[in-house]
């Protein structure tokens, strides 16, 4: 007998839960995607405005990864300018 395990894919919010409250997702949407905040939030939630499943496609996931890496670099550079 074969057992089929139905695993739900984590939403992007779930994957990025550690930084969720520290990031302005609306600013990421505008600056890196040239999209509205609502478009971005729907992708993050995994559900579109019509309550249908949605997610970032591969290109968008790569773009989001790059955006977060760019932001991390910018934060690091800003931190290094603080005189101690």
Model-derived regions: residue spans:
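Short alpha-helical "recognition helix" segments of helix-turn-helix
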Residues: 24-32
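Amphipathic alpha-helical interaction surfaces
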Residues: 34, 46, 50, 70, ...
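Recognition helix of helix-turn-helix/homeodomain-like DNA-binding domains
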Residues: 36-56
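DNA major-groove recognition helix of helix-turn-helix/homeodomain DNA-binding modules
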Residues: 55-75
């Amino acid at each position: 007998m074969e057992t089929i395990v139905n695993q739900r894919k984590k939403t992007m919010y779930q994957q990025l839960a550690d930084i969720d409250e520290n990031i302005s997702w609306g600013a990421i949407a505008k600056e890196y995607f040239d999209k509205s905040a609502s478009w971005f939030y729907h992708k993050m939630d995994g559900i579109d405005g019509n309550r249908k499943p949605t997610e970032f496609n591969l290109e968008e996931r790569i773009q989001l990864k790059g955006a977060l890496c760019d932001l991390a670099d910018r934060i690091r550079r800003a931190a290094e300018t603080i005189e101690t």
